[in-house]
Amino acid sequence: TLGAVTGKVALGSKRETERAIASAQAAFPDWAATSPLTRARVMFRFKELIEKNMEELMVLVSSEHGKVLSDAKGSIQRGLEVVEFACGIPHLLKGEFSDSVSAGMDVYSMRQPLGVCAGITPFNFPAMVPMWMFPVAIACGNTFVLKPSEKDPSCPMRLAELMIEAGAPPGVLNVLNGDKESVDTLLTDPRVQAISFVGSTPIARYVFATASLNGKRVQSMGAVSYTHLRAH
């Protein structure tokens, strides 16, 4: 409310975005080959670090977004629930097997990581929405490039630091502060295999159309609380 500067971060360009993607791509083979149990241990440690640093994260959200501390804490706790879900990844990654579906034929399925995934998140939930995305993707053996809102980037950046402290190797999680140029690079770069987006409906449509046109798996969610009026 006083208009004070809370911090400064570098605004990434296409070049920085490509470097983040390259970092994630380089880290992918070793991380994908890491056992699900080891990845789960990283998630358990990440969960503990979030709980340990809850007060700091609350202040970061409140100071940049403007949420009251109780609201900031609630949003972090909702994101933490997804981290807790990701801790169970050894069980969640189990495949399926069907014996003798036909003469001399069995059928089985396996769940395998895709590669480099990216998440584009909005201003209103700088902790919760990023934690909807990168913990599960990373627990599954993917590497991740997170592009949070440039309006309140400090909490996502701190979460990345905690992820590294938890044991995630370099390049597994990359945080990029950028604008539309960075977004377009993520949507079109062939090294990015999947995109997750939360934000306004017009941008959600743009993200879905652009990313799918470039052959990516897309999860694109626009605004909530729709009102649908129909003539009777």
Model-derived regions, located:
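Short intrinsically disordered, low-complexity coil segments enriched in acidic
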Residues: 1-11, 128, 228-232
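Glycine-rich loop-to-alpha-helix module at the N-terminal edge of alpha/beta enzyme cores
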Residues: 3-93
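Short, flexible turn/loop "capping" segments at secondary-structure junctions
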Residues: 1, 22, 220-222
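Rossmann-like NAD(P) dinucleotide-binding subdomain of oxidoreductase/dehydrogenase enzymes
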Residues: 85, 95-230
